[in-house]
Amino acid sequence: MADGGGGGGTGAVGGGGTSQASAGAATGATGASGGGGPINPASLPPGDPQLIALIVEQLKSRGLFDSFRRDCLADVDTKPAYQNLRQKVDNFVSTHLDKQEWNPTMNKNQLRNGLRQSVVQSGMLEAGVDRIISQVVDPKLNHIFRPQIERAIHEFLAAQKKAAVPAPPPEPEGQDPPAPSQDTS
């Protein structure tokens, strides 16, 4: 986990995503209303699935989720919950392998898969990941992640609202303003 790779699995920061349909909505596809034009986010009510999909797609395109993931991964291996989980898994694996009688014809893939299943079934990963999240992610939620997300949403909605307002017609070029009348009566 500390190598910076992976992501997208259970417990991975930023691993969630939108479906293909909602990703299509975020690119300007028409909505279920059949209006034929792109979706205007400013016209959608808060909590609308299309609005959420548009916002998530915008956050992804800005790289916010990747930034959050990198921020958390840089911090994770310094936390006691991670070190504790790593030690538990190391001990579990050592104990499991000590119980195996080695012979050269052993199927290593079967052994590895059996070990993986045992680790998952033990429940230690789920509990350990929950503790890691509470030590790494939770402290960053309100002070780091939420302000960045809110700022990005406000900028996105403001840009969409600005784009939805038609520009005033341009001033006609080459015409002089009307000359003041010179009435000398």
Swiss-Prot record:
Q: Which UniProt keywords apply?
A: Cell cycle, Cell division, Centromere, Chromosome, Cytoplasm, Cytoskeleton, Kinetochore, Mitosis
Q: Which domain of life is it from?
A: Eukaryota
- GO molecular-function term, one example from the UniProt record: protein phosphatase 2A binding
The annotated region (Disordered) lies at 1-45, 160-185
Keyword Cell cycle set for record: yes
Q: Where is the composition biased (Pro residues)?
A: 166-185
* Similarity remark: Belongs to the BOD1 family.
Protein name, as recorded: Biorientation of chromosomes in cell division protein 1
